[in-house]
């Protein structure tokens, strides 16, 4: 999910090995890696889709922040910048991957459901504070700093409302408009004014359980 970074990381470790024992240590370390979980693959697919569809810029791969394998980081699944003409704004989003045949699927409901999470991203200042700090630390001193500065200025001048939110549902089932119809209607009263909200359902032709093998084969 972060091929260039992982390749450089592995090459750097290999260059540090000066003895057979060191080489064995590095080999064991690299072999201890795990296959990405389905929800991690889903988040990666969502990032690619939003980049292709909207030109969203991702300044940092969040997988690099994991201290525990498979851990889901707090705050938001998607954190980046949306460019709209000459304007730049923060984009925060959540991703759900589901094989549930129900319509809507269960991943949309409850406190961990997609709609509640989008509601939180729209209105929880404490979450915005955490995400802005996280972004600033990863945009300072590089090519993303001007994007951060412009998006932060827009956020402040709009009292925290001029942002973009994305809710992405990834399915391996048949297309069903009911998956998001009622959820979209429920969000109308939650997000008002200049805030932009986008809900997308993407229906992939291969089973969720096959995604890992497909990615591994494509990378070979």
Language model: regions and residue ranges:
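Interdomain/boundary linker segments immediately adjacent to catalytic/signaling cores
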Residues: 1-44
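Conserved catalytic cores of phosphodiester-cleaving nucleases, focusing on short active-site segments
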Residues: 50, 78-80, 90-97
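A short acidic/basic microdomain associated with nuclease active sites
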Residues: 53-71
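Short beta-strand-loop-alpha-helix junction that forms the active-site gateway
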Residues: 95-105
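Short, aromatic/basic amphipathic alpha-helical patches
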Residues: 177-191
